[in-house]
Amino acid sequence: MQSNIKVVTENFRAIGYAAIQISGITVVAGENSSGKSTISKLLYYLFNTSSNYEVLVKEELMRNFHDLFYFLNITYYTAINEDGNINRRIIDVKKYDKIKDLRGKETYKNLSLKEIELYLITFIKELYAKLDIQNSRYNRYVDDILEDQQEKGIEGLKYFVKEKIKQAENKIQKRPTSLFIEKLLDLFEEKLPEIFEVSEDDEVIVSLKKENLSLPFMVNKAIYIDTPMSISISKFDHWDELNKLLKEQGDIKSYQREMLSLISDNIHGEAEYNIDWPYSDFSFTRADGKTFDLNEVATGIKAFSIIQLLLKNGHIDNRTLLIIDEPESHLHPQWIVEYARMIVLLHKHIGVKFFLASHNPDMVSAIRYIGEKEGVLDNVNYYLAEKTEEDYLYNYRALGSDIAPIFGSFNIAIDRISQYSIESDHDDL
């Protein structure tokens, strides 16, 4: 499935102007602090928000119900303690488990809004039928939840739940851009881009100036990998999401087996998620049968293992956008070429889209020439971040498949090395 997505952003952080095509393998190059990672994050949160809009609205709904859940929890456990007889609990434990699992096990993600409403209202009715809440200290908690709402007591709580559910339904139906804007404000903690637009087949589907967020057809999942060190670590939202995907078990498709064999041959082993593994969630079994904690193996093996696990779990297909910052980091020079080949073949055989931020000449050239050999060079697009007249601001120049300007920028580093070489010292004498 050939993608034809164009992303335009202007006057945001280090980015002066960028118009980036996502049509296969997109590689952006440039010096540090030129805005490459900013574009990566914009793309990730855009497609993550758009594709998971309903789940994100439900997450917001759970936050809106935070005080209600607290009230239901303490009321239930107080009732158990006061009753004292586990065999004749006055409130059905199964009904409470449904409420507890909404948040604890995140069952809300797989429930309809009407089912969530039914669970909550059923349990509220149970509490009021079995306990004297109206004439207890818990009534003050109810008043705090309802705030200025006119309806109070059980009818007030039922109204509160139904109104929040109705608001969530309305948001899912209309898909306001405000949800994406809130994500950006939370992420960057500063003003928004002056311009941020995404078009698909020349039709604008996302804009900070549009009221609604359309659903892209060519990409329904974005996965952001900014370091192989993120395995098993919870620090950022995109690390949490990546680890969830790495743990989810799925079926291996027939067209994925060749790629899995290629990765296994490169790293001489298999990465697995095993809940019974004693040292970590993730393990790596070498070709000789020895098993290790994946967190303790070479970082290069981790880099390949992430792709291996995503493939195994069925999370990489022709509508996936893999966003990888500096994929060459921690890789041996020989593995840089093999990693680039893996990227090209994933695009060729599966249709995966890539957005790569790199400043490594081996990675840049390997993508170019392996892409040509594999017949997908028309789907490879390079961009170079170039300084503007304004300090700390860069425009992104589209290069097509021409990598010569990128190597010209790499030569700046060689020039700087020569400034400190022995010959330069002699020239100064």
PLM regions and their residue ranges:
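Switch/communication elements of ASCE P-loop NTPase nucleotide-binding domains
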Residues: M1-N52, S283-S418, I422, L429
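Phosphate-coordinating catalytic segments in nucleotide- and nucleic-acid-processing enzymes
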Residues: K6-V8, T49-K312, I316-R319, T388-L429
